[in-house]
Amino acid sequence: MNNLILIAAPGAGKGTLSNDLLEKYDYVHISTGDLLREQVAKGDDLGKKIHEFQVAGKLVPSEIVYEALEKKLSDKACDNGYILDGFPRNIEQAEEYERILERSGRELGIVIVLDIPKEDLIKRITGRFTCKDCGEIHNIYSEELKPVKEGVCNKCGGELTQRKDDNLESFEVRYQTYLESTAPLIDYYKEKGVLHVIDSSQGHDYTLEQAEKLISN
């Protein structure tokens, strides 16, 4: 059984790796967004509290997010392992998460950091295009993913589009947020002896292979 935390800057491939691991190991995927939506759908007291904040257009307080997470971890489906997506985002959340684990009788597991140079991240973000029809992802800076014909999907011939926030300005904002809030978690988990760094600039296949080795150890 493994509980995983994935730490990565925007564009490092965290989402792709997470999806592949979920498919292979039948882990539970836990993201704060899905967690809150799931709780609202249940319609219990906690779900009603969350809904009130959402309707008012306010951020859901951390204490309520923690409560929802603790409820989720009590689910037997998590016994086989789970991947935390987008949490914790800072030291405060990491410390509270460990208190939740202690109360839930679960282990911290392993923390995987996807390491990649900033210039490579920029190319991954600004060069990324997605097919409107089949969802296939292309990248104009990648020999493997580059569209043969400009603006046309290699897989189905559909039109390629780019997300509005896949630009340098948006990337810099997200990257700075990562450096200020999330990156300090690297030293935090390194001191706890649970941190593992993968050079994800080597490509997705290499990244997945290394992650699988960590899980099997």
Predicted regions and their residues:
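Glycine-rich phosphate-binding loop of ATP-dependent small-molecule kinases
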Residues: 1-217
